[in-house]
Amino acid sequence: MKLERKVYIAGVGETKFGRHEVDFDVLGRAAALEALKASNIDRPTMVQSAYVGNGTNGMVTGQTVLKDLGMCGHLPIINVESACSAGGMAIHLAVRDVALGLADVAIGIGCENHTLHMAQGTAFATAMSDIETVHGAVMTGKYAMRAQRYMYETGATAEDLAMITVKNRRHATNNPYAWFKGEISIEEVVNSRVVASPLTLQQCCGIADGAGAVVVCSEEMVKKLGIKKPIRVAGSVVRSGPYHNRPRDITGDDITEETAHQLYEESGIGPEDVNIVELHDAFTIAELLYYECLGLCPKGEGLKFLRDGNATHGGKCVVSPRGGMLSYGHPIGASGAAQIAASVKQMRNQCPGYQVEPVPRVAMTHVTGGGCRARNTRHARCTCW
């Protein structure tokens, strides 16, 4: 989406990820309140549209989240479902409202609680009309096949994949919002329980509860609200895959490649300009594949990019500086929103103990959603100041 007028992030909020005994609406409100406070918004009537992303917690989740904030009854509240990209999609739509002049202030929220709502044995299954689901395919199995093929084609080892968990846990060491953090060795990752070979338990994200929220506004409102360090949204792009099940290159992701290409073209920012990236590292192999798909390195050089230390502090681009999904866990509808919230905090130098230096000027987030190829959606966003 090419932005018709400038859009700025005024404030962000997020909750700690993990297991929560409070429901999704409490988590969503906590993140929203933090974002509203950071935006100097003290009256609910100042917000002109709201989008709430959620994956599994039922109907009218947005109204449930926002009713106790005084937002019901005076603004449109739109509920967004897009599997794992729901939170990112909610913020994309809030950005669109401001970009098109439909609102001067809008909020996007992603929230989820699986602890209180998990349907045992059926969680996250795609529709049984999906040919891959009918034959027993699940996400972990699909990514395991991608890992096996990638290792066969490139010579990558189990230790290479484990390096990503080690890196991301190290990034999250001092992050109070992360669920899993602290030093872990390559040996501990490789020797943890096998889930779907070659992926072990420590190479798969945990299914978590949590929330994230982002308030966006026009340039005029930035001045009225007195935002000291507004973050400009340089671009925000959503693409969906075609409906087919034909053979494909499972070591790539053409939807992500197309989304990233469109984002760079519309924003005028190239991958070489990006300082930090939060991507969809639901599994170690996913992060490795997305290095190339997002253009962080040339095709065929993702493994070299990792081995050379280019995805961590002191490298070309710090990938998953908050610790990624491998450290936060993955609350389906909330992850995309939390990625953006964490990136904005990095750009505002608000991450003591895990701050990227020098302070990032350009950040990119990437989240995917869907089961089979036909239902996949990709969301990528570039922000700068």
Swiss-Prot record:
InterPro entries registered for this protein in UniProt: Thiolase, Thiolase-like, Thiolase_C_2, Thiolase_N
Signal sequence interval, chain numbering: none
Active site residues per record: C84
Annotated TM spans: none
Role, per record: Component of the BbsAB thiolase complex, which catalyzes the thiolytic cleavage of (S)-2-benzoylsuccinyl-CoA to succinyl-CoA and benzoyl-CoA, the final step of anaerobic toluene metabolism.
Protein family (similarity comment): Belongs to the thiolase-like superfamily. Thiolase family.
Catalytic activity as recorded in UniProt: (S)-2-benzoylsuccinyl-CoA + CoA = benzoyl-CoA + succinyl-CoA
Keyword Transferase part of the UniProt annotation: yes
Pathway, per record: Xenobiotic degradation; toluene degradation
Induction (UniProt): Induced by toluene.
Protein name, as recorded: Benzoylsuccinyl-CoA thiolase subunit BbsB
